[in-house]
Amino acid sequence: MKTMKTLLSASLALTALSGCQPETEKPNILFLLVDDMQSDAIAALGNKNVYTPNIDGLIAEGVTFTRTYTNGALCGALSMPSRAMLMTGRGVFEVQSDGMKIPECMVTLPEQLRANGYQTFATGKWHSDHASFNRSFAAGENIFFGGMHPYEKNGHCSPRLHHYDKTGQYKETSFIGEEFSSKMFADAAIEFLSTAAKAQKPFMAFVSFTSPHDPRNQLPDYGKKYKAKDIILPTNFLPQHPFDNGELAIRDEQILPPPRTGEQLQEELALYYGMVSEVDEQIGRVLNALDATGERERTVIVFASDNGLAMGQNGLLGKQSLYEHSVGVPMLIIDPRSKKHGFKTDALCYLYDLYPTLCDIAGIEIPASVTGVSLKPLLEGTTDKLRDDIFLAYSNQQRALIKDDYKYIIYNVEGKITEQLFNLKK
C-alpha cells in the first residue's frame, strides 16, 4: 500500500508538472528592431567604418539572412507600412491605409503570441494605431507613437513618449523624456525582463528603437564617435541622382540638398554611424539584462531594421527608392536550440516572413491572415531556398524584381519610363 501511495504521489506530481509544461516549453522571444539602418552598417558584415560589437556578437551566435527585403511602400514614410507588414505577416498591397491602422481581421504577431499564453510587452516605436497596439501588448512603457522625433523639439534628446494605457485611449499618458530615446527604451526593456522571467509564462519583448533614424544632429554622451575625415565613402556615392525618380523633393532628400560633396557625406555618415553605435550599446545593455535573468538559453532573439537608407549611394539621402540600400534590411535570428552559429544564408526573403517563422519556432498556429513564408526550413538547414524572386514597389512610380543575382527596376515618372538592370554580385 505504501508503495502504491508513493507511486500515486509521484504520478500526480508529474501530471502537475506536465500540466504547466506546454507554456514553459515555448521559447521566450526578444525582438530588437531598429529604424533606418542600412543592411551593411555592421562591422561583422564587412563595414570598416562602424563599431557594432553587440550586433556583431548576435551575428556570431545566430543565422543572418543577408538578402532580406522590406516589400516597399506606397507612401514616403516607409517605416509605417514596413512595420505593419512585419506585425501582420502581409505584403505591401495587403496592409490597410499604408499601415496607419491595423484592423482586427489582421491578427498581429504579438496578438497571436498573447492568445497562446505569452506575456507581451513593448517599448519604443509603434507606427500604427493605439487599438492595434493594445490588442498586441498586455504591457508597455516609454512608448513612442509616430514616425520620428521632431528636430524642433530636441529630437531624440527629449522624446515625447507614453506610459501604457489599459483603456487604449492614450489621452493623458504622454510625457517628455529626459534622456536619449534609445536609453529610455532599453531602460524599459530591462525593467520588464527583470520581472518577466519570474512569471510562469513565456514572454515576448518588443524593443523598437527609433535610432539611427534622424535627427542626427545631437548624439548622446555614450557610444563611439566618428571623425568625418576617417569615413570611407560608399563606392557608389554620387553627388546627385542621375535622373528624376519621382521623389527627389521629399523631406529626406532635403536634409542635405543635392548636389552633395564627398566631404558633406562624410560629415553625415560620421553622425549616422554615431547613431548606429549608440543603439548598439543599448542593445548590449538589454542583452546583459537578459543574461542576468538566466533566460538567455530559453530565448529566441531577433534583430532587424524596418527599412534601410541611402547615405550618398546613387546620389540619394533617403529611403524612397528600390535600391539595395533602401529596401534591403539587416535581419538575424538566434534560436538557442539550434546548432547553427555564425551562419549566413543568401536565400531571398521578406522582412514580414518573420511572423510565420516565429510562430513556427514557438509551435503555435499561423493565422490564416498571414501570407508570409516561414523561414524555419532555412534555420534548420533542410533547404537553401524558399522564394524564387522578390517583388518590390514604391509609390505608383517605381517597381522592381529580383531574381537570382539580378535586379530590374522600372520607373514611370509623369509618363517617362526609365529602366535599370543590376548584377547584384558585382
Regions of interest found by a model, annotated:
Residues 2-3, 7-12, 20-419, 424:
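Formylglycine-dependent sulfatase
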